[in-house]
Amino acid sequence: MSRELQDVDLAEVKPLVEKGETITGLLQEFDVQEQDIETLHGSIHVTLCGTPKGNRPVILTYHDIGMNHKTCYNPLFNSEDMQEITQHFAVCHVDAPGQQDGAASFPTGYMYPSMDQLAEMLPGVLQQFGLKSIIGMGTGAGAYILTRFALNNPEMVEGLVLINVNPCAEGWMDWAASKISGWTQALPDMVVSHLFGKEEMQNNVEVVHAYRHHVMNDMNPGNLQLFINAYNGRRDLEIERPMPGAHTVTLQCPALLVVGDSSPAVDAVVECNSKLDPTKTTLLKMADCGGLPQISQPAKLAEAFKYFVQGMGYMPSASMTRLMRSRTASGSSVTSLEGARSRSHTSEGTRSRSHTSEGTRLDIIPNSGGPGSSAGPNSTEVSC
C-alpha cells in the first residue's frame, strides 16, 4: 500500500489491571461462572460472564502468551463503550492451561498441548455450557488458536476479531533466535519483546514496566514457558486467498484483523490479511498504538467491535457512538465496517474521512491485501 496512514490525536494509556480489579468487579451486574473443564487434551479454565441468550453467539476470548484473560481483556471489557455490547452477549473467557491466576505447576513430564490441540479443546467448552456458536476475540497466540478452531469448526464460529494474528509457523531462523534468547534473556524480557515494539518500549516505559512486573510476580514461570514453547512450535495455518475455480482453505466467517501501527506484529497481520477472503475481511490499523490495542485504546477497539457485530446483523438498534454521530452529521455514507467492506471495489485513490470533536479519524482505504491479488475484489483497510 503506497498511501501512508495518518496518526490520530487521541492516545489512551491505561494499566493492564487496575489495583484491586477482578473479573467479578468488571461485570458485576452479570452472573459469573468459573469452571475447570475437562477436554480431549486436559483441563482448561473458563470464566463465563452473563447468561447465553437463545441462539445468539457468545463472545469467546483467548489471550496471548504472558497473559491470562484478566490482564489481556479487563481494560477492554471494563470500558464504558463495551458495556452496551456485553448487555447483548454473554462473554466466555478461556485461559490456556496453567495461565490462570493462582495456577499450580504442572507435574514433571507433563506434555503441554500443542497449538492444534489447544484449538481442539474448545468444542468441549462450548458443549459444557450448551453453546452453539461464538464470536471469537483472540490476541497473538489466542488469535492463532481461534483461527485454527474456526478452520476446523466453521459452523461454530460466526465471526472473528483477531489482534496481532500470525498465520505462519516460526521460521528456522526465528526458532534459532528464540532458542538463543532463551539462553540469554530472562522470561519477562522475552515476553515483553513479543508484545511491544522498540518505539513503544521507549515511549511507554510505565506500561512496559507494569507488564514486566506482572510476568515476574503473577505468572507461573514454568507453565508460561510451556505455553511459549507451544506457540513457537505452531504450524503454518495453510490458508490462501480464495480464487475463482480454485479449491482453497480460508476462513468462512467475517473477520476483523486489528493491529497497532507500531506493533511488532504489523507484517504478520498484513500477511494474514492477504490470505483471507477480501469480501469478508477488514484490516484495522490503529494509529498511535502499539502491541496491545485492547489495553492502550479500549474505547476505539470497542467501537470497531460494535460496528463489526452490527455488520453481522446483531444490535441493529444500538445507540450511535461519537464517531457514528459525527459521520451522520457530516453526511458520510460510511456507516459501519461492514458497510465499508461492501464498497471495497472502488479505486485505490478513494478515501473516506470522518472527524470527531476529539480529533479521532477513521479512514477507509481500499486495500488489495497483497501483490498478485488485483484480479479479485479488494479487502478494506481501516485506519483510526
Swiss-Prot record:
Tell me the gene name.
Answer: NDRG1
Q: What is this protein called?
A: Protein NDRG1
Keywords in alphabetical order: Acetylation, Cell membrane, Cytoplasm, Cytoskeleton, Membrane, Microtubule, Nucleus, Phosphoprotein, Repeat
Tell me if tRNA processing is a UniProt keyword of this record.
no
Q: Where are the sequence repeats?
A: 339-348, 349-358
Q: Where is the composition biased (Polar residues)?
A: 327-336
Q: Which residues carry this modification: Phosphoserine?
A: 2, 319, 326, 330, 332-333, 336, 342, 352
Pfam name, any one: Ndr
Entry-linked InterPro entries: AB_hydrolase_fold (IPR029058), NDRG (IPR004142)
Q: What does this protein do?
A: Stress-responsive protein involved in hormone responses, cell growth, and differentiation. Acts as a tumor suppressor in many cell types. Necessary but not sufficient for p53/TP53-mediated caspase activation and apoptosis. Has a role in cell trafficking notably of the Schwann cell and is necessary for the maintenance and development of the peripheral nerve myelin sheath. Required for vesicular recycling of CDH1 and TF. May also function in lipid trafficking. Protects cells from spindle disruption damage. Functions in p53/TP53-dependent mitotic spindle checkpoint.
Gene Ontology biological-process entries? signal transduction
UniProt lineage: Eukaryota, Metazoa, Chordata, Craniata, Vertebrata
Q: How is it modified after translation?
A: Under stress conditions, phosphorylated in the C-terminal on many serine and threonine residues. Phosphorylated in vitro by PKA. Phosphorylation enhanced by increased intracellular cAMP levels. Homocysteine induces dephosphorylation. Phosphorylation by SGK1 is cell cycle dependent.
Give the originating organism. Answer: Bos taurus (Bovine)
